[in-house]
From Swiss-Prot:
Any one Gene Ontology BP term: negative regulation of DNA-templated transcription
InterPro entries named among the record's database cross-references: ATP-cone_dom, NrdR-like_N, RNR_NrdR-like
Co-factor(s): Zn(2+)
Function: Negatively regulates transcription of bacterial ribonucleotide reductase nrd genes and operons by binding to NrdR-boxes.
Official protein name in the record: Transcriptional repressor NrdR
Keywords annotated in UniProt: ATP-binding, DNA-binding, Metal-binding, Nucleotide-binding, Repressor, Transcription, Transcription regulation, Zinc, Zinc-finger
Zinc fingers classed as unnamed: ranges: 3-34
Record organism: Streptococcus mutans serotype c (strain ATCC 700610 / UA159)
Similarity annotation: Belongs to the NrdR family.
Length: 163
């Protein structure tokens, strides 16, 4: 590994540990020439994954687009950035394990919706209003009714479990 200070090509690894939930290895290195210490990260090079959009066009998968969409939907909500990061990691892991080279934007949107439904209902509704492009208030009411029914059934299950 080339030293960032003197450009010498040989360095030794001083420390090595996992980072980012085991998806990355962080290495602390020392240049054999000038003894400068620096950090490198090693991760698996993912094969490019293409997203097939509704109009048939393809673009490279971007976890940042998912992250930014959720951030916008979660504005002024009690949802931590670490919770959002976990949701994005879970979605990306599901996509990469289930799809080799292409995935539909509809599949991604549905995965995001499923995760947000568990994370925060308001964030879910905000995301859904953009993702589903509601045409009128009736469609929003139907979504709210689905959420209400889901919350009621969760409360009923919890009550049944405690009795």
């Amino acid at each position: 590994m080339r030293c960032p200070k003197c450009n010498y090509l040989k360095s030794s690894v001083v420390d090595s540990r996992q980072a980012e939930e085991g998806n990355t290895i962080r290495r602390r290195r020392e240049c054999e020439n000038c003894h400068t210490r620096f950090t490198t990260f090693e991760r698996i090079e993912e094969l490019p994954l293409l997203v097939v959009k509704k109009d048939g066009t393809r673009e490279q998968f971007s976890r940042d687009k998912i992250f930014n969409g959720i951030i916008r939907s979660a504005q002024k909500r009690p949802v931590s950035s670490s919770a959002i990061e976990k949701v994005v990691n879970d979605i990306e892991q599901k996509i990469r394990s289930d799809y080799d080279s292409e995935v539909s934007s509809v599949v991604i949107g549905n995965l995001v919706m499923d995760e947000l439904a568990e994370l925060d209902e308001i964030t879910y509704v905000r995301f859904a209003s953009v993702y589903r492009s509601f045409k009128d208030v009736d469609e929003i009411e139907a979504l709210l009714q689905q959420i209400t029914n889901r919350v009621r059934s969760k409360k009923k299950r919890k009550a049944d479990e405690t009795n």
